[in-house]
Amino acid sequence: DDNSFRTYGKGYQPEERDNWRRENVNKLIRELKHTIVKTKEWVRFGISPFGIYRNKKSTPDGSGSNTNGLQNYDNLYADVTLWVKKKWIDYNIPQIYWEIGHPAADYITLTEWTKMLMTSTCTSGRTWLAR
């Protein structure tokens, strides 16, 4: 990671390494979407990321879910909401394996948060989420 950051992290300060990592993942997702559309525009591209995007306590504006666990954005460098908003992915099926009532990551809390994200960005008015 240190060698890669020194070699390819031009324009980023050492304290911005997380942003550099996220941008590398964003570039992969963006380029995959572009290649798929260019090659076979009818193919749909989706992601099945970890179930927690961000915990509420990690977001300055409180927009994260009311959870307490590993996070896509902060720990895995996956900015899933950006991909949805930029329409780089056609669908998002997070890996939500916690049970209803789980103290750190309640199933209902996570599915409702994901539904809110997808509904607010879905132009067709349809979402994938069913309960």
Language-model regions, residue ranges each:
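Polysaccharide-binding and catalytic clefts of secreted carbohydrate-active enzymes
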Residues: D1-W88, Q95-W98
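C-terminal soluble interaction/assembly domains
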Residues: N66-T67, P94, W98-I100, A105-R131
